[in-house]
UniProtKB/Swiss-Prot annotation:
Component of the origin recognition complex (ORC) that binds origins of replication. DNA-binding is ATP-dependent, however specific DNA sequences that define origins of replication have not been identified so far. ORC is required to assemble the pre-replication complex necessary to initiate DNA replication. GO terms for cellular component: nuclear origin of replication recognition complex. GO terms for molecular function: DNA binding. Pfam families: ORC6 (PF05460), ORC6_2nd (PF21913). The keyword Disulfide bond does not apply. It comes from Dictyostelium discoideum (Social amoeba). Keywords: DNA replication, DNA-binding, Nucleus. Residues 454-469 have a biased composition (Polar residues). PANTHER family: ORIGIN RECOGNITION COMPLEX SUBUNIT 6. This is Origin recognition complex subunit 6. Residues 218-241, 275-309, 356-423, 436-469 are annotated as: Disordered.
Length: 469
């Protein structure tokens, strides 16, 4: 669209405007032969607008933008580009022009003009010579600031970015101008702050689901094959794992552990086997019976089988015997009876070997001196009789483990599982909950949880203590 077509649509018939605008378009072609890019469609309208402003001819800006088929921002950018290419200083915008660009009411326009006049009379005593040395109130920044203050006072939202582009200033200088007007005219009561531009919505990298493309190892030169796999997003909250990492890595390369070398089986004590050997008539029989049995593994010295009739405990290794879940032993009275019978038979056999002399105390002493085992057998017989009587009076009771031992065994098994890394996620979460509850209970019972006395209560208590002394 040429300049003449735009002027015909606007019904503008002024040769001065046409000549000046055509001269500006020629200069732009000379200085910028590549054109203005996206602002090229606004070039004829910008040339007409600048020419009318220099010749002080009224022009409807909104109608001009509508004829060009653009928006206000692009049109303002094209005007700025034209002033920079021509090397001219842009004239400041008036309050009427700013209100026309934002299509504001006449009341806001009048109130903003009155506000600017009041600021001009109050600042630096209203002396124009002093004002010209420090500030330039005729600049478009103060007029734009007064318009923005009045729009905020009447709760009207306008695009402050477009306002800053009209004035061609930074956000900080515009805020300083608004603060100066409000502090002078409103006595610092109504300070209007410029709304900051919201930052661009950048997607958080943590919330993105990571995708990794893996190339398969079977890739040839002619037919390349790739396999795409997607991995699930990591949880933002890390779950604490109680299983050690060194054991998790070595799960696949674990050797086969024998039952004796494993820590779980070594912690369990092997079962105790009760052996009740029969008393023999001579020392040779006792030696043969002891040799048939396996030697004890414990380092403690063992008692002679022929000397006592009490049951002897042998510690047998876990490799020889299987580990039963529970082992209970009952003391029956029948065993004691059999033992007493054997003792009686052996004593009678030894007495028969003695000479047929009168049976006196001296003869008994001689028999005991010749065979010292007889005295021990007599003692053992008396002990067995007492035990049999106690067994009849008190029936045998099965051994029951107390609850504390059971709890300790459970805790040991859980600790072993934690050390080996055999716990599941649910079991680990339950352990974490129990630990937190225990910590809370400990804190509750401690002195930190108790309420501290306030200074008022403390003073009352001091007065009461001093009164009762």
């Amino acid at each position: 669209m040429d300049i003449e077509d735009v002027m015909n649509k606007l019904s503008l018939k002024n040769k001065k405007v046409l000549n000046r605008s055509s001269e500006y378009s020629r200069l732009i072609k000379v200085k910028r032969p590549m054109g203005l890019g996206p602002l090229e469609m606004c070039k004829p309208g910008a040339c007409i607008f600048v020419a009318c402003k220099e010749l002080s001819i009224e022009l409807n800006k909104s109608q001009l933008v509508r004829v060009l088929g653009t928006n206000d921002k692009l049109f303002e950018q094209s005007i700025l580009a034209l002033y920079t290419i021509l090397g001219k200083k842009r004239p400041p915008y008036s309050i009427v022009e700013i209100s026309n660009t934002f299509k504001l009411n006449s009341t806001i326009c009048e109130s903003s003009e009155n506000l600017l006049k009041l600021y001009r009379t109050k600042i630096l005593g209203g002396i124009e010579e002093v004002q010209s040395q420090f500030t330039n109130i005729d600049d478009g920044i103060f007029s734009a600031a007064s318009v923005y203050i009045m729009t905020q006072q009447h709760s009207i939202n306008i695009d402050h970015t477009l306002l800053l582009s009209l004035v061609d200033c930074s956000q900080e200088t515009f805020q300083r101008a608004m603060n100066a007007i409000t502090q002078c005219c409103y006595q610092g009561e109504s300070i209007v702050k410029l709304k900051k531009t919201p930052p661009k919505n950048k997607q958080n990298t943590i919330l993105r689901s990571p995708t990794s493309i893996l190339i398969s190892s079977s890739s040839t030169l002619n037919n390349t094959t790739t396999s795409t796999t997607t991995t699930a997003p990591k949880s933002p909250i890390p779950i604490p794992s109680l299983t050690p990492i060194s054991q998790i890595k070595n799960l696949t390369t674990k050797p086969i552990v024998s039952p004796s070398s494993s820590p779980l089986l070594s912690s369990i004590s092997p079962p105790k086997v009760l052996a009740t050997p029969t008393l023999s008539s001579s020392s040779s029989s006792s030696s043969s019976s002891s040799s048939s049995l396996s030697p004890p593994l414990s380092s403690n010295p063992t008692t002679d089988l022929s000397s006592t009739n009490e049951p002897i405990v042998f510690n047998i290794s876990s490799e020889l015997l299987p580990i039963p879940p529970t082992t209970t032993f009952k003391n029956d009275g029948n065993e004691n009876k059999n033992n007493t019978k054997n003792c009686n038979i052996e004593i009678i056999e030894e007495i028969s070997n003695v000479d047929e002399s009168p049976f006196n105390d001296n003869s008994v002493k001689k028999i005991e001196q010749s065979n010292p085992n007889i005295s021990n057998k007599k003692r053992s017989r008396d002990e067995l009789e007492k035990e049999s009587e106690l067994g009849k009076s008190q029936p045998p009771q099965p051994q029951q483990q107390p609850q504390q031992q059971q709890q300790q065994q459970k805790e040991k098994s859980v600790k072993n599982k934690i050390n080996e890394g055999d716990l599941t996620l649910e079991q680990e979460r339950l352990l974490i909950k129990k630990k937190k509850e225990q910590q809370f209970n400990d804190w509750k019972n401690s002195d930190f949880a108790k309420s501290k006395p306030t200074p008022v209560n403390a003073t009352k208590q001091l007065t009461l203590d001093s009164f009762f002394k």
